[in-house]
C-alpha cells in the first residue's frame, strides 16, 4: 500500500486507509542503505537501475572505503519500491533490456522531508520533456550511443533546442539526432511506430528540405518491417515526383542492424522495391573511414 505523505507534517505520514505511520518507521523499513540509495537517486537524477547501483556503490566506496555488493543495492531498491517510494518499469530498446526507476509522489515528499532539498530532474523527466515518451527517449539515447561508438561524427546532438531548424514558410524541423562531420550534417529520426501516416509524411517531407538522405531507425524487425516500412512506402508513393526530382534516398533500419553496420531497407526513387540488408559504409568528411 502506498504512503500518502502530509508535506506540512514532519513526523507522520498517512496511509490510504487513514492508518498513521511515522516517517521514522519508513526509515527503519528501508535501512541505511535504502536511505543512501534514494538520496543518490534523487540528488543525481538517475533513472536506470544499473546506473543507480553503480552510483550508490561508488558513493559508499568514496565516503567510507567499504564495498557494497550489487545484490545488496538491488534489495534496497526493492525495499524502496515495497514502501511506495519508487516505481519501476522494464524498457526494451532493441539492443538492451533494463529497468528504469522514478520517485512516486510519496517518494518526492519523503526526499523533501528527509534531505530538505528538491530532487534533481531525473533522466525520465527529461525524456518526457524533450521527447514523445520515455521509451522514445531511451531509443534515442541508445541510437546516440551506437553512433558515438562508431567514432564517425565530430558532434552528435539529441537536444531539441539545439536541433531546431527553420526551413522557411514559417515551418521548422526538429530531427531526433543531428550529427556533424566536418561541414556536413546528418539527420536521424528514431521512430516507435506510433505516428499517424499524415504526421509521418509531414516529418519526412520536412527532412527533405535539409537532406536527400532520410535515415529512420526503429526498435525491432516487427515495427520496422511492418509499420514503418508501410509508412515509408506510402509516403514515397504520395510524394514520388518531388522525391525523384531531389534524388532522395531512404534508409530504414532496426537499431540492432544499425549497430551491426547494416541498413534493413534501402530505397531509391528508381526501383519499385527496396534493397535489403545493405552494408553501411561509415565515412568521415574527406573520405577518412
Regions found by a protein language model. Give the residues of each.
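Mg2+/Mn2+-dependent nuclease catalytic core
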Residues: 193-212
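Interdomain/boundary linker segments immediately adjacent to catalytic/signaling cores
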Residues: 43, 54, 63-142
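Non-catalytic C-terminal interaction segments of nucleic acid-processing enzymes
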Residues: 2, 14, 19-26, 34, ...
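Active-site metal-binding core of divalent-cation-utilizing nuclease and nuclease-like domains
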Residues: 148-199
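Conserved beta-strand segments of the P-loop GTPase G domain that flank and frequently precede/overlap
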Residues: 188-191, 215-219
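Short amphipathic alpha-helical interface segments
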Residues: 27-63
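Short, Lys/Arg-enriched N-terminal segment that forms or immediately precedes the first helix
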Residues: 9-28, 119-127
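Short beta-alpha junction loops
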Residues: 107, 217-224
Amino acid at each position: 500500500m502506498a504512503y500518502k505523505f502530509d508535506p506540512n507534517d514532519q513526523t507522520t505520514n498517512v496511509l490510504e486507509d487513514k492508518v498513521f505511520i511515522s516517517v521514522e518507521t519508513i526509515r527503519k523499513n528501508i535501512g541505511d542503505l535504502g536511505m543512501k540509495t534514494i538520496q543518490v537517486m534523487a540528488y543525481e537524477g538517475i533513472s536506470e537501475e544499473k546506473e543507480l547501483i553503480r552510483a550508490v556503490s561508488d558513493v559508499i566506496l568514496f565516503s567510507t572505503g567499504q564495498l557494497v555488493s550489487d545484490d545488496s543495492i538491488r534489495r534496497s531498491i526493492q525495499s524502496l519500491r515495497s514502501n511506495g517510494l519508487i516505481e519501476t518499469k522494464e524498457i526494451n530498446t532493441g539492443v538492451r533490456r533494463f529497468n528504469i526507476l522514478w520517485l512516486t509522489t510519496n517518494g518526492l515528499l519523503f526526499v523533501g522531508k528527509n534531505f530538505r532539498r528538491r530532487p534533481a530532474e531525473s533522466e525520465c523527466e527529461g525524456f518526457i520533456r524533450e521527447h514523445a515518451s520515455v521509451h522514445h527517449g531511451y531509443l534515442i539515447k541508445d541510437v546516440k550511443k551506437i553512433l558515438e561508438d562508431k567514432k564517425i561524427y565530430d558532434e552528435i546532438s539529441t537536444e531539441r533546442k539545439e536541433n531546431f531548424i527553420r526551413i522557411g514558410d514559417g515551418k521548422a524541423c526538429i530531427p531526433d539526432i543531428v550529427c556533424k562531420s566536418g561541414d556536413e550534417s546528418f539527420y536521424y529520426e528514431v521512430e516507435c511506430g506510433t505516428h499517424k501516416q499524415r504526421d509521418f509524411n509531414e516529418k519526412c517531407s520536412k527532412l527533405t528540405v535539409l537532406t536527400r538522405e532520410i535515415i529512420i531507425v526503429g526498435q525491432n524487425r516487427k515495427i520496422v518491417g511492418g509499420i514503418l516500412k508501410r509508412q515509408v512506402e506510402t509516403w514515397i508513393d504520395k510524394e514520388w515526383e518531388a522525391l525523384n526530382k531531389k534524388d532522395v534516398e531512404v534508409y530504414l533500419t532496426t537499431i540492432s542492424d544499425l549497430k551491426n553496420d547494416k541498413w534493413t531497407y534501402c530505397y531509391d526513387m528508381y526501383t519499385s522495391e527496396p534493397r535489403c540488408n545493405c552494408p553501411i559504409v561509415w565515412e568521415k568528411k574527406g573520405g577518412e573511414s
